[in-house]
UniProtKB/Swiss-Prot annotation:
GO terms for molecular function: ATP binding; single-stranded DNA binding. NCBIfam families: recf. It is found in: Cytoplasm. PROSITE patterns: RECF_1, RECF_2. The keyword Nucleus does not apply. ATP binds at residues 30-37. Belongs to the RecF family. This is DNA replication and repair protein RecF.
């Protein structure tokens, strides 16, 4: 798939911009704070209805406006698909083929993206919430039912936590009803995640072995607050975990076990990767990103769109060449950079957009 056209209206520092893209390589060139990353963020937001840079949607709206509008035309093997997002103070409206979508899971997945940014190193050494978000964003694109199950789980979780925080006497029977619902959706979420991690590890191990000159083996482990060793009895394991945690939950007035507490760990040759070098972290994250591309292709039969936010200058020649190998294949890529000097051996079929003060000019014109 590839993004043919993007229209931004009052998004970040863009007042109104319309831009047609190259199906292969697109480079956003400009000084810092001109809007290069904002352009990538707009593409990411159009795909996922979420920003990778802020949790506060109003930060995306131009400072002197009250709403924003994004639209794009995605080309796929099955034809073209118009996508739209309108964001106001009241919330967001999403459209596919000009038809309003009722649920997030009905919208996400029509355009798949893989983002690689400097802050992705936090995937290895950052907080567990960063890794859970990573799973949610990537898995949600290739398996829309996951977003539906996750939304339902979070809804029940919020109900349970609100009830635990209430001043009224706790009704154990009602709490058990909530627990049953939490177990139902929680097991669905965990099963989706376990399947995703297994596939990601398979693709990632091969990529990392190549990147490390056949000396490092990558493995990924899903760390759960629930016993996940026996998937056939996952529901029973979750129930037992909730029962054991009940006195703790009543005291702390929140839910201490479940997929909202889970994490993933990365290992290099059996050792915790978080203790590795900066170079190992870069290689590992690059391996994961390249694995994501292959994983998405294997499931959707479409190549995702690759977004590279000022990462080429962070990579040595070996890693750059590996990334450029991927770019030279049939995958649309967007790169931000302050200088073309950072980009070596680029494919010939590319478009360069000069970004300045929230405006984009193709080939500097």
């Amino acid at each position: 798939m590839w993004l043919q056209h993007l229209s931004l209206k009052t998004f970040r520092n863009y007042k109104e911009t319309k831009i047609d893209f190259n199906p292969k390589l697109n480079v956003f060139l400009g000084r810092n704070a001109q809007g290069k990353t904002n352009m990538l963020e707009a593409i990411y937001f159009l795909a996922l209805t979420r920003s990778h840079r802020t949790r506060t949607d109003k930060n995306l709206i131009h400072f002197d406006e009250e709403q924003l509008h994004l639209s794009g035309l995605v080309q796929k093997k099955t034809g073209s698909i118009p996508l739209e997002i309108e964001l106001t103070q009241k919330g967001r409206v999403t459209k596919v083929n000009h038809l309003k979508q009722a649920r997030l899971s009905d919208y996400v997945g029509h355009m798949n993206v893989v983002l690689f940014a400097p802050e992705d190193l936090q995937l290895i050494k950052g907080a567990p919430s960063i890794r859970r978000k990573f799973i949610d964003m990537e898995l949600g694109q290739i398996k829309p039912i996951y977003l539906s199950d996750l939304t339902n789980y979070n809804h029940i979780l919020k109900q349970r936590n609100t009830y635990l925080k209430s001043d009224q006497k706790i009704d154990e029977t009602f709490l058990s009803v909530l627990d049953d619902q939490l177990v139902d959706y929680g097991c669905r979420v965990m099963n989706h995640r376990l399947d995703f991690i297994k596939k990601l590890e398979s693709f990632g191990r091969k990529k990392h072995f190549e990147l490390s000159n056949q000396i490092e083996e990558l493995s990924i482990s899903y760390q759960s607050s629930v016993n996940i060793t026996d998937k056939q009895n996952l529901s029973e394991s979750f129930k037992i975990a909730l029962e054991k945690s009940r006195s703790r939950d009543l005291f702390k007035k929140n839910t201490g076990v479940g997929p909202h507490r889970d994490d993933i760990s990365f290992y290099i040759n059996g050792m915790d990767a978080s203790f590795g070098s900066q170079g190992q972290h870069r290689s590992l994250v690059l391996s994961i990103k390249l694995a994501e591309i292959e994983l998405m292709e294997s499931i959707t039969t479409e190549s995702p769109i690759l977004l590279l936010d000022d990462v080429m200058s962070e990579l040595d020649n070996t890693r750059q060449l590996k990334l450029l190998e991927t770019i030279s294949q049939s995958i649309q890529t967007f790169i931000t950079t302050t200088s073309l000097d950072h980009l070596q051996n680029l494919p010939e079929n590319l478009s360069i957009f000069t970004i300045q003060d929230g405006k984009a000019a193709v080939n500097g014109n």
